[in-house]
């Protein structure tokens, strides 16, 4: 005898199937959250619930009966209490293979993949994958069929979690398929291909460079398909960020050599790539050879309109920029209205972290100049200064008016964003007592921080801060 809630769900499944009417989604979602070992231990539980679910999933009217896909959430929760061997009693090998590769009902395919995922660590599951060449066949579904997104996501999830030695061996059969896709040059298929290669590179050290190294000629060719070219550059951004165990020097050098040939949208993605490279020591040599930070390659920054050079100086590692162009301050930064032009202000914030450039900038970081900034800009600048010891020292020792008036004053800030910025600034200023000048301000900083954190009720009110447009 089933408990009351299980019986209610079973009745709803059977009635909805017979009448071809929508399930009680809220009922089933609530039930999914309650399933535990005591639920599934009820006599004949699996024998009643699973067939009732299967009848709906395999019915041609499944989209009518289960419009919210609640069964796709319910069934995995039930199956998680069974071993792979037990699951095969309800979903035999032939059933799984049939609905993965022959009769493709989207929801049933998703369930079959979920069955594999739930039991991937079991020897029987690995044997099933091996004996039936499942991984390789799934890849063919990805690249040669119109695979639904939900199924594609499950396939990619399956490949992502293959991390044992035996499991990785299963992936080796994928390489011939990947090579075929790579050589076809179909950008629709290559878009999926890039995601998969990104997953596999960490597992297959013998990966052929041809599979991940696109050529200069290909980059030029794909200019006719800028959306794919953006995806391709994002692919390299991910590989650099994840420190993929492969040599990317050649494709990265080719991308940078074509920087000026790309349109603005693509150049903006290259900026993201350059920024990532600048924070990765092993690729500094590529940036040096490209000369992308040399003054003659940054002339667009003076145009006072949004452009990729401004983004580049706002995002890349400022210390690396300086190391590759020692004249960056006198040649470029000194000629920009970093404080008053909104386009250039992110460049100022970025270069706060460079000790070398900061000592050239700090002559302009005085009480008078900072006091003239709108409050939103001032607090963003102070937040950046509060994250580096060299700029904290300058704030403590050379900006007493800013400290007293803007950070230690007791007047309520009625702008939510500014209030949160101030709280974060105070937290940062208090996190290192070794900074020269800290002791002088310590007591007042602590008092204000505690007052904001524990003793003041912040009332969300209309902003009273004047933010003016200074892009001219």
UniProtKB/Swiss-Prot annotation:
The keyword DNA damage applies. One of its GO terms (biological process) is DNA repair. It is found in: Cytoplasm. Signal peptide: none annotated. Keywords: Chaperone, Cytoplasm, DNA damage, DNA repair. It comes from the Eukaryota. InterPro entries: HSM3_C (IPR040752), HSM3_N (IPR041335). The keyword DNA damage applies. Disulfide bonds: none annotated. Pfam families: HSM3_C, HSM3_N. GO terms for cellular component: cytoplasm. Belongs to the proteasome subunit S5B/HSM3 family. Involved in DNA mismatch repair in slow-growing cells. Acts as a chaperone during the assembly of the 26S proteasome, specifically of the base subcomplex of the 19S regulatory complex (RC). This is DNA mismatch repair protein HSM3. It comes from Candida albicans (strain SC5314 / ATCC MYA-2876) (Yeast). The lineage of its organism: Eukaryota, Fungi, Dikarya, Ascomycota, Saccharomycotina. The gene is HSM3.
